[in-house]
Amino acid sequence: MLRRDILRLGAALAATPFLHSAHAQSAGPRWSTGAAASVARQELYPEVLDGRIYVAGGLLTPNTGVSAHFESYDPATDRWTRLATLPEARHHIALAAAGGLIYGAGGFSGGFPNWRAQASTYVCDPRADRWRDGVPIPYPAAEGVFAAISQRLYLVGGRTRAVEGARHFNEHVDTARAVSFDPATGHWSAIADAPTARNSAAAAVIGGRLYVVGGRQAARQTDGSLRQVNVADLEVYDPKADRWSVLSPMPQAQGGLAAAAHGGCLYVFGGEQWVPEQKVFDSAWVYDPATDRWRALPSLPTPRHGLGAATVGNRIHVIGGGTRVGGDHASVVHEVLVLSDAMT
């Protein structure tokens, strides 16, 4: 008798919309779908400002094409809006927001293989929908990470020109160099170099510190070609101490991945691998700084690399990226990791 009563109660609870919804919210993270981006592209570094997600530049398909597109996504309406284009088409241009403005730093000009890292920066006031030239980075930089902490901007790692006249992908080298920019003074300053020189990493800010994860290193072979080897390293920069610390590495080395922060944790998505075999990852992970531990998340519905991630509310939006290794399969895919109330 008691068993029948319990079964009836369970059926009644499952049939009650409110209670069912509450149960679904507490069940853990799940994937949903957002409106497709207006342009298929990859090598994206999005930023959030005033509840909107901004995406600029990128590689088109085929990868000889470079985008100057700039658009914003409003999660409240699930709509994309085209905005003023970049002054110059760029891919691997990194975005960060401070003082109500969007800053675009460096990136490559030119399609493959004629990539050329740039030192120029651009600044956009979304209210005016207009770009202007910013203060150049002290050195050409692309494929690094860029983020704002307490109204200062931090640019770390990536690739820079091996020689000033570099006009080819193979004429660039990985760097551990790091700099910060003060919008109030318009000056760039050197900060402590990162422990690891790498490109195609991802980063997010948690508790006023910059977490840099994954990516890859380009090793030159005897024939002059580059061998791209993924790294799993996780490092954190404390701007108050100007010091880096090494943390537990990712369970799996992923390059060309995306990262975002939520609830004091670091979330990472996707990426690709060139050696020992070529593959695109659907893997997603979350790292908790309080325990220095990683755990797996539900896999990306669509494996991608060169994608971007951005957090608004209790949702992480994972946008664009290439669906196959290399640069010829850019997408408009927009998938959303919905996090439970317990994780907000």
Where are the predicted features?
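Kelch-like beta-propeller repeat domains
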Residues: 2-13, 24-344
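C-terminal segment of classical bacterial N-terminal signal peptides
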Residues: 17-21
